[in-house]
């Protein structure tokens, strides 16, 4: 079974995210548990936590299919000590918020070397950051998102994702989220080489680590390393790819999350994706 949703607003409180997801016909969703553009946010209140859990139960959202995203400011591979410590503290806070909400997954972009350290050194720092956070928390899996490889962002190549996983001590609490737009613009031709790309993912990383997907079409070309999402069927990936993915059982039983730019089309996109399953 496919679990499809979108990255919905939690404006006014995290408890509104499941309500917003229900309104677009979703059975999965993503959210920010705090302001994603601030380093520090107020702690979650007991009432917000209680209402979030109540609304998830009310609208039949299971925690396996909720994929919170961390702050865009965090860089777990930061080459400078101050930036690294700040990022690690913020990441721990994000993971603890997930614990409080009873969530099992936390999705994040791996990090950037900022042209100051080697790719391998940065990847090792990211793994170390994950290890430190997992040691201080329970029950939440760190879900690394592949990137488009824009600038000095790492995680655009499958071997880099594997490099991090290999250095994480608790393999049961690390996973991958594949973003279709990022995969395409990173240079993997999911349109013309569907089988080849996912065979390569299986060989390099392994489907046992895949914990979710972001379903986005792309405004930018294959291998452009530019991250610009488009609505399903309107970009350069096209609807045929998404139709094939919906029929592929390897993507069952995980959150499939839209981050497409026109939010008014989310209900329509979810309905279409369900219709081609």
Curated annotation (Swiss-Prot):
Protein name: Probable endonuclease 4
Lineage of the organism: Bacteria, Pseudomonadati, Bacteroidota, Bacteroidia, Bacteroidales
Species in which this protein is naturally found: Bacteroides thetaiotaomicron (strain ATCC 29148 / DSM 2079 / JCM 5827 / CCUG 10774 / NCTC 10582 / VPI-5482 / E50)
This protein's record includes keyword Metal-binding: yes
UniProt cross-references to Gene3D superfamilies, sorted A to Z: Divalent-metal-dependent TIM barrel enzymes
Coiled coil (residue ranges): none
The enzyme's E.C. designation: 3.1.21.2
UniProt KW keywords: DNA damage, DNA repair, Endonuclease, Hydrolase, Metal-binding, Nuclease, Zinc
Role: Endonuclease IV plays a role in DNA repair. It cleaves phosphodiester bonds at apurinic or apyrimidinic (AP) sites, generating a 3'-hydroxyl group and a 5'-terminal sugar phosphate.
Binding site for Zn(2+) 2: 145, 179, 214, 259
